Amino acid sequence: MIQKFLKKLFSDRNDRILQNIQTVISKINSMEKFFEKLSDLELKRNTTRFCYRLNNGETLDQLLPESFATVREASKRVFGMRHFDVQLIGGIILHQRCIAEMRTGEGKTLTATLPAYLNALQRKGVHIVTMNDYLAKRDAEKNRLLFNFLGLTVGINISGLSSKLKKQAYNADITYGTNNEYGFDYLRDNMVFCREDKVQRELNYALLDEVDSILIDESRTPLVISGSIEDVSDVYIKINEIIQVLFSQKQEDSDVFVGNGHFYIDEKQRQVFLTERGLVRTEEWLVSQNLIDKKESLYSSKNIVLMHNVVAALRAHYLFFKNVDYIVKNKKVIIVDEHTGRTMEGRRWSDGLHQAIEAKEGLKIRSENQTLASITFQNYFRLYKKLSGMTGTAITEAFEFRAIYNLDTVVIPTNTPMIRDDKPDLVYMTELEKFDAIIEDIKQCVSRNQPVLVGTISIQKSELISQKLLKLNIKHNVLNAKFHAQEAKIIAQAGKLRAVTIATNMAGRGTDIVLGGNLEFLLAHNNEKHTDEKMEDVIKKWNIEHNLVLKSGGLHIIGTERHESRRIDNQLRGRSGRQGDCGSSRFYLSMEDSLLRIFSSERMISIMRVIGVKKNEAISHPFVTKAILNAQQKVEYRNFEFRKQLLEYDNVSNEQRRVFYYQRNQIINSKDSNIGDIIKNIFCDVFLKIVNKFIKQKLLKQSQKILELESCLRDNFNIVCSISKKIRDNIVVYKSDLSKIVLKKVYQSYQCKINKYILKDVRKYERLVILDTLDYFWREHLASMEYLRQGIHLRGYGQKDPKQEFKRESFFMFLNMLSSSRYEIVSILLKKSISNNDFLKIYNHAKLVF
């Protein structure tokens, strides 16, 4: 009842938004004839006029109708493509800081040119964010023609570019790039040692393509820049052997601590927990391997890292599988994105998991890394002044977009009605029966010339289907993490006559599947080989194939398993039925599928048995459909709570990151003449704290504390301050006077040192000392924060709120880090002998770490 009410409420709201936009659409359409009469030069001059009006008080909203009409007319002349009204609607929604749900094939790339042009008029930069380098390069090269025609510049920000080329890309009016590159560039910019080395401008407006993948699917994996630390590969190799002496138990047999087994697996949470028996056995084994001392606890502070390594080894063996979660290529473990099926080159799991998997596979273990800088996509993209996005599937995650990013979701109507036939799910008892039915469906499609796209959830499943098709001599293409380079080409031709394409999850997003094959790809492929006459033959052949595919029923989608998220299922279905084309879809399931096995109710399994489903017989019933939907909703809610919890913890780190980067940027942006004042402030802060630490009374008397203060100043900072002699000589000394005496001595001592060593670039040296020291303590703080986060849940057993405890402890850790870094800066500047060589050493060390 509540779901129906919410659905109706959202539908009414969506309709109201679209209705309100119609006035603007009518205004844009009324300008079309006028703009058609303008020359190319006059159309281009509109950009200059818009910028002038913007600088003189007009708003972007006031310029919207004319700017959209300008882009539409320019597109007609450059591409021969006219923006449909629904694309204008999408452009307006994107400009209004919302998420536009636009079905596959509705022209999201062309739609994005409208808000990109309008917001680029501010000359503050527009970042269009794509999922991979191929899409960024493709869209930039295509749309550059349009934007250059209108007098705007376009940059491409992809992996492998030099800092110089990146800076050029960011200085363009509109920049195309990947989510990873934008995030990593932000982190790298906050690690540089001079302002000129930064590549990004102020983060103004980001428009995210496939926004659901970036802000939801990838939000759990933070961007991390790491540096190598101590090699502990022998420890991982030894701990990998512990798998042979530990055995699991069923979760329902016990709670976390009691049971006959050594550990149990929580598949829902993807975690492994040691039982009390397992803890004892593990400690005994570690003692035998000389990894811990006899009678030592695995939970003691000195062994907590080993504890994490043991759990990582168990997770590596029982929760992470080859050709599902990762592949082994060139003797390296490469992560497979669970949502897209794409490999994630260069990315490594944290918490020792990656090393544990390398040990499991018998590969060379790369040394563990220390985090130098990190940020989640959630917090990175919230740094932009303005954010919007588009995707074919967003409505199921509308609540999360609103709750976390303050983004409303609007469903954009299709240009032509969608006529795809979504057939009901078929559920089999076993996986073997399910795959037999899938193969039979593929055979029938091929026999009637119908193209088929088969979506799988893992490389393993895609290769299983491929092997079955090979035995039947059915030609097909496999698209998974192992064949990433062929992705766009294969998916573009998945609509050809009798084409059978097996794709892992949503590999190939961003490339349209055209019935009969992608004509643009075909023409580009044949352009170098054939004459104009031959090219006409290619077009004629395509038209024949296109019509035959339409008669066969269009692209048929086969889902081999329901994904944890309905949105991913909708993405697969959305590949068919584009722009009013015919098409069909069906999902095949079995009671052995992970979703149903882990999350469905026992009642559903019982009903399947009571019905007495025969071998190779499927069940299709509203009750089953509802049970599957309930299972998916359970997982979606769990994943949302997980992402929400991750964000709550990361928000604490994010606030500290914001303060730290602000202070760091103050140092970088300060003129050399101001660095001296910053040094004085640091000296003042540190030495006042030192005086307050030793001296409590207002009027000084001879005491042990005064001698300790003198010793501290002498030993740690080379400052000789004879306070005790003054007191012995009966000179009255107050605490306030003492602070002034100490600071005066400090300033004199430091000035003498500068004069003595005649350092040419003293201010640059000071700047580098401050930055290098701050960065060192920040790295150590990040490691401490991670250890705190990993163990904070244990506070719950003491009736304390782990989140509040994390906030409280991390706050004091941060203050201590800032205080310790200032103390170290002062110690280096006062105690260390300095020369021009020291300047070079610190500079080179900083560059090496970076």
Swiss-Prot record:
ATP binds at Q87, G105, E106, G107, K108, T109, D512. Its EC number is 7.4.2.8. It comes from the Bacteria. It is an enzyme of class 7 (translocase). GO terms for cellular component: cell envelope Sec protein transport complex; cytosol; plasma membrane. Its main location: membrane. One of its GO terms (biological process) is protein targeting. Gene3D superfamilies: Helical scaffold and wing domains of SecA, P-loop containing nucleotide triphosphate hydrolases, SecA, preprotein cross-linking domain. Transmembrane segments: none annotated. Signal peptide: none annotated. Keywords: ATP-binding, Cell membrane, Cytoplasm, Membrane, Nucleotide-binding, Protein transport, Translocase, Translocation, Transport. It is a peripheral membrane protein. GO terms for molecular function: ATP binding; protein-exporting ATPase activity. SMART domains: SecA_DEAD (SM00957), SecA_PP_bind (SM00958). It is found in: Cell membrane; Cytoplasm. Pfam families: P-loop_SecA (PF21090), SecA_DEAD (PF07517), SecA_PP_bind (PF01043), SecA_SW (PF07516). It catalyses: ATP + H2O + cellular proteinSide 1 = ADP + phosphate + cellular proteinSide 2. HAMAP family: SecA (MF_01382). NCBIfam families: PRK12904.1, secA. Part of the Sec protein translocase complex. Interacts with the SecYEG preprotein conducting channel. Has a central role in coupling the hydrolysis of ATP to the transfer of proteins into and across the cell membrane, serving as an ATP-driven molecular motor driving the stepwise translocation of polypeptide chains across the membrane. Belongs to the SecA family. Monomer and homodimer. Part of the essential Sec protein translocation apparatus which comprises SecA, SecYEG and auxiliary proteins SecDF-YajC and YidC. This is Protein translocase subunit SecA. It comes from Buchnera aphidicola subsp. Baizongia pistaciae (strain Bp). The lineage of its organism: Bacteria, Pseudomonadati, Pseudomonadota, Gammaproteobacteria, Enterobacterales. The gene is secA.
